[in-house]
Amino acid sequence: MAKKRKPNFLVVLIDDLRFDELGICGHPFMKTPHIDRIGHEGAMFTQAFHTTPLCSPNRASILTGQYASRHGIIDNVARDAHSHRLPNYHVILRRLGYETAHIGKWHMGNSGGPRPGYDKWVSFPGHGSIIDPILNIDGDERKYTGYITDLLNGHAVDFLKKKRDKPFALFFAHKAVHPDAFQAADGTIDFTDGGYRPAPRHADLYKGAHFPRRPNAL
């Protein structure tokens, strides 16, 4: 009898993107063709919600399957040491013979250094920078030239194309569309030198469009 093949796992997380800002969800002018294609060819969960829709608790819940009250990351205060102890599902998959990778934003703590459970690590401190970001690649942290979405995409594609004789699990967490911001260890955020900047090729994509400011916007 042929040995049953283990499935690969690819999770793509987009930061600070509301469900109703996608073309497939009816937005009048947002252009999201690639995400729309995934939705049309796959499944959409129209009643899904998260109990703690905040950056760090949300990520911890996705990686552990636990409520924030159980995994202990309840806010965006820097919890670097705590994030090393999370019962992360990649730790389990690695024990089962998977090649594991985290590429992109971690933000359970402000350190961009590797966490347990990963064979490949590409991340950055805190929220990261949109242009010319500092990246930590397997413990080597330095500044790179380019647009962060493109840089992370390149690392993800390289990992997916790698020849291997074992299954893989990739957690691919974009910084986009989160704006640049400085976050202190106590969780407070300074947007003084922040804001969102599109890639130069997309600078005029929404030229002339009116973006109404939501009542709850900062």
Enumerate the language-model features and the residues they cover.
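Active-site segment of extracytoplasmic enzymes that catalyze sulfate/phosphate-ester chemistry
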Residues: 11-12, 19-102, 112, 116, ...
